[in-house]
Amino acid sequence: APFAYTQNHHEQIFKALFAVQNAKVESRQKAAQIMREYLHEEMVIQFLMKSFTQGRWLFNVDALFNHYSDILHWDTIQPCSKETLFIRGGGSAYISTTEHFTAIEQQFPKAKIQVVADAGHWLHAEKTQQVVDQIKEYLN
């Protein structure tokens, strides 16, 4: 949501990513095994493993960690007059409160909010086809 978050919900993910990076493992199997020491959702592990190849992460873990507060931050913007799609997981705490809906409505007055009922925050990984279908429907 276009909303500043104050809590770090990804601390264990960062611990897992750094553990793999520091172990200097080459294989995806060993990397996933290390991640399981920190993470208990296999779907999250497998999603993150898509970005691990030849013994390294395809994204900059250090930069993400060092700038995590910037990622959580959001400056309220002037209303955007463009039609905008937000897709949320029905089981996610993101885009779930009156405060979130109000922030979206104020900044994106033409927003459409879709829900993928049986998905959490990682809906793009959990219910990929449903997310793709909703995006296609919106764009058509």
PLM regions and their residue ranges:
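Alpha-helical elements of Rossmann-like donor-binding domains used by nucleotide-donor carbohydrate transfer enzymes
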Residues: A16, K30, I34, A63-N66, ...
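Conserved serine/cysteine hydrolase catalytic core
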Residues: Q54-F108, K112-V115
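Flexible "cap/lid" loop of the alpha/beta hydrolase fold
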Residues: A1-S27
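Catalytic active-site module of serine/aspartate enzymes centered on a nucleophile-bearing elbow/loop
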Residues: P109-N140
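Short, solvent-exposed loop/turn segments at secondary-structure junctions
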Residues: P2-F3, G91-A93, G120-H121
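Short, solvent-exposed coil/turn elements at secondary-structure transition points
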Residues: A23, G90, A117-A119
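Conserved alpha/beta-hydrolase catalytic His-Asp/Glu region
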Residues: N22-Q78
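Conserved strand-to-helix beginnings and helix N-cap segments that scaffold or border functional pockets
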Residues: Q7-H10, T97-T98, A125-Q129
